[in-house]
Amino acid sequence: MPCGEDWLSHPLGIVQGFFAQNGVTPDWEKKVIDYFKEKLKENNAPKWVPSLNEVPLHYLKPNSFVKFRCMIQDMFDPEFYMGVYETVNQNTKARVLHFGKYRDVAECGPQQELDLNSPRSTTSERQTFYCVPVPGESLWVKEAYVNANQARVSPSTSYTPSRHKRSYEDDEDMDLQPNKQKDQHSGARQAGGLGGLHWRGEPKRLETEASSGQQLNSLNLSSPFDLNFPLPGEKGPACLVKVYEDWDCFKVNDVLELYGVLSVDPILSILNNEERDASALLDPMECTDMAEEQRVHSPPASLVPRIHVILAQKLQHINPLLPTCLNKEESRTCQFVSNFMSELSPVRAELLGFLTHALLGDSLAAEYLILHLISTVYTRRDVLPLGKFTVNLSGCPQNSTFTEHLYRIIQHLVPASFRLQMTIENMNQLKLIPHKDYTANRLVSGLLQLPNNTSLVIDETLLEQGQLDTPGVHNVAALSNLITWQKVDYDFSYHQMEFPCNINVLITSEGRSLLPADCQIHLQPQLIPPNMEEYMNGLLSAVLPSVLNKFRIYLTLLRFLDYNLSDDITKAVEDDFVEMRKNDPQSITADDLHQLLVVARFLSLSAGQTTLSRERWLRAKQLEHSRRSRLQQQKSVNGNEL
């Protein structure tokens, strides 16, 4: 373990040291960031940092150094806080400067008072993100992160393990101050807030107000607090994330790994209740709006903890089996990629066999499923996303559990996914599109608020005849826009705002999908298992965990390979296409060339090749010919269904 645990258990002490050494000059802030950067470069140091994703909140010590893997669900307005404030000793009149950065509560020592009029005080600005665990994150990803984390935590002196059993609306008396900290602040006399920081009150008063918290919250939080997760059934903490540097680099739906100071001070809930009570003196309508916004933006810290970010990194992916950043020219990353690429061919062959079994013996469909799973939007030309490869797997057995179990297979392979059951009822009732709630001043999530590289499986096999109402029509249109343009238009009431995305969409259907797709492959099962669940479970249990991990690395890594076509290859492809048009002018179009190039691109990448060879071009033509022939055969059997 890295030598010394102060940076983990008492990061604010480290910050205080730099502040004391450097005074109010900007140097101290940079030195703090550099210090923690260097600490995290030490051998396995990130694994020693407790993670809010894996460790229950009641096991984490307040004001300790933590990490959090999350998605930015919303961005609140910037807020001002006391960057530097001054206290005065009532007896000696000695003045002391304190830093307000990385804090929600201004600390006052014994016999000290906060000087609100000090000319040495400074006001600074910070940005607040509302962050949630990565939507749709696969169970194998969570388990891998848990197994890799070496942080040793036990229930803190501030929490008890039974705390998490309390209902959301209760934030009753619970002393969150370690004994040591209580002694330090026993002389404080004030309570209140200024510039984003609250200052601590008399301990007896604190305990009295905390004991009345249950009554206050039963009035103000009469309904359970909505954590605003995009997907149903999601678990884990939501956090208010305070960002101090470079917040313009981040945007909604970015996936981040954050390192910072955990703040769960109960005085936040107490003072927020006081502010809500005070707002009752205002105009009733204005009071209602303000109370709702206050409730959403300042929830109980025991339910939505705060993280004061020291370091933040935007994640390219969340696959724990790969290096975090795949673009850096680091020796370890290069070595990892080189080693894996050397054994790519057998991994692809095994994956093809595995997916062939999952697709009931259909090896052609398995080929296209591999191409789909490694596809990604690599650039945009005007509004057109290049690299998307939405596949419609038609011919799926109706009234069967096949699509459900196929999705389970995909869940075991990709880091994040979601299955949307496309029924008339769901289309009419589900909230797919995020919308702005102006009363609470927040972005209310929808099912399509997903991070990049999520696999979205739309299951049409349950779709029956029925009437779509207006919300249903809007939802279907939203899915079509997502597939065609790789964007979701968020609803801001008075206008729509485009949010570009990079979502892999697989549509399973009986006939041709109602939704647009880049490629339709009709399933031709070679076997129909009498017990689908038993068959699929047997398929999963037969794969060694080490082999399954290779599949996971393969599907993530190939998305990040660069791919280029030389002028010679481009000319050869164009000449070949001209010959194809001569031989079959009626059925070969420019769209067919585009489709062939997309298939050839991902076919090459699936073999670890970053440019197109003649062999891969011929193989792409062969695959496309087989796929089209199959569709024609099916069309002649079923009329115009396909």
From Swiss-Prot:
Residues annotated as carrying Phosphothreonine in the record are T160
Originating organism = Rattus norvegicus (Rat)
Subcellular location per UniProt equals: Nucleus
Q: What GO CC terms are in its UniProt record? A: MCM complex; nucleus
Q: Which gene encodes it?
A: Mcmbp
Concerning its family, UniProt says: Belongs to the MCMBP family.
At the top level of its lineage, which domain of life is listed? Eukaryota
Concerning Pfam families, the annotation shows:
MCM_bind
Name this protein carries in UniProt: Mini-chromosome maintenance complex-binding protein
Entry's Gene Ontology molecular function annotations: chromatin binding
- Keyword list, A-Z: Cell cycle, Cell division, DNA replication, Mitosis, Nucleus, Phosphoprotein
